[in-house]
Amino acid sequence: MALEALNSPRLVEDPLRFNGVEQWTKCKKRSKRSRSDLHHNHRLTEEEYLAFCLMLLARDGGDLDSVTVAEKPSYKCGVCYKTFSSYQALGGHKASHRSLYGGGENDKSTPSTAVKSHVCSVCGKSFATGQALGGHKRCHYDGGVSNSEGVGSTSHVSSSSHRGFDLNIIPVQGFSPDDEVMSPMATKKPRLK
């Protein structure tokens, strides 16, 4: 009886038939075909199924050369021949070679150290930009006109100094009642703090 079971052709479910049905049922779209048309009453024997699989493999071609794994491009350093996975990583690595050898003439990534031509006339400090020098000079004067000649901001400070106060200096907190200016409107109430 065991020999008869081994020699008799076995019935095998068609895996492609069920894959197609699953695709139609997943879409949830109605078809004009009835479900009985989708299901074939024909069941494959094991031999037919194996023959069908061999036909599918034969159609594929089976060339192992055609199935190539997509290799990631590698970028190689021209100096030490190290390889990197990205061009940006190679660029960062090349910068290390430039710093080791003292840089090149065509190296445009490093900032140039220009001669500092803006010199403070009070203390002699030099600055790269005139704006930095102007900000530095504010620490030398206490709201009054500086003694240095040839500074463009001196005339501006002297023209505003006739008012008796400088907006750049923190105001003095203590006022006497005599220093307070009264408003011409008598009905104006004092501001609450």
Swiss-Prot record:
<dbReference type="GO" id="GO:0009409">
    <property type="term" value="P:response to cold"/>
</dbReference>
<keyword id="KW-0677">Repeat</keyword>
<dbReference type="Pfam" id="PF13912">
    <property type="entry name" value="zf-C2H2_6"/>
</dbReference>
<dbReference type="GO" id="GO:0000976">
    <property type="term" value="F:transcription cis-regulatory region binding"/>
</dbReference>
<dbReference type="InterPro" id="IPR036236">
    <property type="entry name" value="Znf_C2H2_sf"/>
</dbReference>
<keyword id="KW-0863">Zinc-finger</keyword>
<dbReference type="GO" id="GO:0005634">
    <property type="term" value="C:nucleus"/>
</dbReference>
<dbReference type="InterPro" id="IPR044653">
    <property type="entry name" value="AZF1/2/3-like"/>
</dbReference>
<keyword id="KW-0805">Transcription regulation</keyword>
<dbReference type="GO" id="GO:0008270">
    <property type="term" value="F:zinc ion binding"/>
</dbReference>
<keyword id="KW-0804">Transcription</keyword>
<keyword id="KW-0238">DNA-binding</keyword>
<protein>
    <recommendedName>
        <fullName>Zinc finger protein AZF3</fullName>
    </recommendedName>
</protein>
<feature type="zinc finger region" description="C2H2-type 1">
    <location>
        <begin position="75"/>
        <end position="97"/>
    </location>
</feature>
<dbReference type="GO" id="GO:0042538">
    <property type="term" value="P:hyperosmotic salinity response"/>
</dbReference>
<keyword id="KW-0539">Nucleus</keyword>
<dbReference type="GO" id="GO:0043565">
    <property type="term" value="F:sequence-specific DNA binding"/>
</dbReference>
<feature type="zinc finger region" description="C2H2-type 2">
    <location>
        <begin position="118"/>
        <end position="140"/>
    </location>
</feature>
<dbReference type="GO" id="GO:0003700">
    <property type="term" value="F:DNA-binding transcription factor activity"/>
</dbReference>
<dbReference type="InterPro" id="IPR013087">
    <property type="entry name" value="Znf_C2H2_type"/>
</dbReference>
<keyword id="KW-0479">Metal-binding</keyword>
<dbReference type="GO" id="GO:0003677">
    <property type="term" value="F:DNA binding"/>
</dbReference>
<comment type="function">
    <text>Transcriptional repressor probably involved in abiotic stress responses. Binds DNA in a sequence-specific manner and can repress the transactivation activity of other transcription factors.</text>
</comment>
<keyword id="KW-0862">Zinc</keyword>
<dbReference type="GO" id="GO:0045892">
    <property type="term" value="P:negative regulation of DNA-templated transcription"/>
</dbReference>
<keyword id="KW-0678">Repressor</keyword>
